[in-house]
Amino acid sequence: MHMEKLRVIISGGGTGGHIFPAISIANALKEEKPNAEILFVGAKGRMEMEKVPAAGYKIIGIPARGLKRPLYSPSNIGVAIDYLRCKCQAKKIIKEFKPNLVVGVGGYASAAIVSVAAKMGIPVLLQEQNSYAGIVNKKNGKNADKICVAYDNMERFFPKDKIILTGNPIRKDIAKATQQQKEEGYKFYNLDPNKQTIFVVGGSLGCRTLNE
């Protein structure tokens, strides 16, 4: 029996918190189905345009931008125009690539692709990395078939019947640290292995509160 090749578009980005889970998803898909074709769609000029090709995947950039605060800012007129351009490009990308599935990982780059894919009847999966859902994923929740989350109580943001508690995708080089590597880490950072360590980071774009 002939099996149709899996073709997946993964869209999102803007920050490492979106990009690296997306790459982990792609790696897992390729491991499960080596013949799968995967295409990334990200925002032009953002870090995904560098990180995704470095991981060995093709990416197409679209002119996606996030809304400015306050929302009545005049610059948001340009954001709205760019979003319409993104939707036109998204339709063209989907028609040419013919995906079996579209995965949205959040970030403004995923807004147009997920919206257009849902309207074209293509299955949509969202992946939300945070305990407080991002604006784009919250909006796209109504268009998704399933939503993979990392935390409990996400019914606050998404329809309960669509939620699957999966945890966050983790890169293998992080998840599979050897005991020797762990011991070296404890020693390097002068940590007590018998105590829990809390690691606080501000994200790939930095954090003003922490920096100050």
Question: Where in this protein do the model-derived segments appear?
Answer:
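Glycosyltransferases and closely related glycan-assembly transferases
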Residues: 89-102, 109-125, 138-146
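Active-site-proximal region of nucleotide-activated glycan assembly enzymes
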Residues: 37-39, 58, 118-186, 191
